[in-house]
């Protein structure tokens, strides 16, 4: 019995060390999403601009990025110029203005330009909840049928676009070509 008391702390230490060692090789930016491979959630929410109501059907037809953003999000301000540049290059981007005041969102888009073909107002965060959003910015890649193919958590900068999202986006574009 005395021997077990002496060995137990060593065994616990080794077990904890193995888990910590394994954690060194995990990517903290890579958060698994249960939504990958599933249709974009059904929603009926107002547009940020204008009086129209948008639904998931408005997102169908072509591959697109769906960017979750907010005026309160400092990182969103960092990625916004990259999104503007991508939109100028013809990349289809839809916005989800997450848990934000609509007047603030309109001012933001006026001040920093609007890269979004459609911009969904999600003031209560219901769509964000259905998407499994942890915060902002988060960007989803959807195919022409509205299936979520990829989720990226964090700032989409030029490196992230070039190395991660652009190849996936281009692959979806190529799938749709005859």
Residue ranges of predicted features:
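Thiol/disulfide oxidoreductase modules built on the thioredoxin-like
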Residues: 6, 110-115, 122-178
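A short beta-strand-turn-helix
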Residues: 43-65
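C-type cytochrome heme c attachment motif
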Residues: 71-78, 138
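A generic structural signal for alpha->beta connector loops
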Residues: 42, 90, 116-117
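Hydrophobic beta-strand anchors of alpha/beta hydrolase catalytic cores
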Residues: 65-66, 93, 139
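Structural microenvironment flanking redox-active thiols in thiol-disulfide oxidoreductases
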Residues: 77-113, 123-129
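Short pre-active-site segment immediately N-terminal to redox-active cysteine/selenocysteine motifs
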Residues: 62-64, 68-72, 135
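N-terminal targeting signals for export/organelle localization
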Residues: 1-46, 178
């Amino acid at each position: 019995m005395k021997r077990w008391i002496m060995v137990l702390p060593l065994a616990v230490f080794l077990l904890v060390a193995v888990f910590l060692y394994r954690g060194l090789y995990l990517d903290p930016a890579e958060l698994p999403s249960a939504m990958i491979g599933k249709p974009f959630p059904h929603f009926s929410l107002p547009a940020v601009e204008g009086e129209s109501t948008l639904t998931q059907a408005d997102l169908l037809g072509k591959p697109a990025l769906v960017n979750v953003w907010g005026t309160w999000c400092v990182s969103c301000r960092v990625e916004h110029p990259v999104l503007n540049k991508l939109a100028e290059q013809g990349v289809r981007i839809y916005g989800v203005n997450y848990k934000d005041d609509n007047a603030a969102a309109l001012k933001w888009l006026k001040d920093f330009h609007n890269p979004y073909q459609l911009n969904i107002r999600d003031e209560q965060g219901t769509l964000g909840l259905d998407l499994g959003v942890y915060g902002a910015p988060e960007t989803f890649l959807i195919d022409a049928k509205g299936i979520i193919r990829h989720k990226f958590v964090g700032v989409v900068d030029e490196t992230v676009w070039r190395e991660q999202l652009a190849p996936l986006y281009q692959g979806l574009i190529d799938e749709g070509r005859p």
